[in-house]
Amino acid sequence: MPNEATPAEVVEIIGRTGMTGEATTVKVRVLAGRDQGRIIARNVLGPVRVGDILMLMETAREAKKLSIR
């Protein structure tokens, strides 16, 4: 079942990132799967707020800080 997404809840909004501020860095808590309960940082495009549920295709990768120019 490698094509299934894993739900994750947004617990904190860290800030805007990217060259023009187009992405938002958030901390999410993985709700299911082998990484259940783990909190990771992810970059999100589009509107997002605390409490939203994101469907992640991959839970092993963490977001790095994108440069702002």
Curated annotation (Swiss-Prot):
Any Pfam family hit: Ribosomal_S28e
UniProt keyword list: Ribonucleoprotein, Ribosomal protein
UniProt-listed PROSITE patterns: RIBOSOMAL_S28E
Domain of life assignment: Archaea
Record carries keyword Protein biosynthesis: no
GO biological process: maturation of SSU-rRNA; ribosomal small subunit assembly; translation
Molecular function terms from GO: structural constituent of ribosome
Annotated GO CC locations: cytosolic small ribosomal subunit
InterPro entries, per the entry: NA-bd_OB-fold, Ribosomal_eS28, Ribosomal_eS28_CS
Family per record: Belongs to the eukaryotic ribosomal protein eS28 family.
Protein name from the UniProt record: Small ribosomal subunit protein eS28
Origin species: Thermoplasma acidophilum (strain ATCC 25905 / DSM 1728 / JCM 9062 / NBRC 15155 / AMRC-C165)
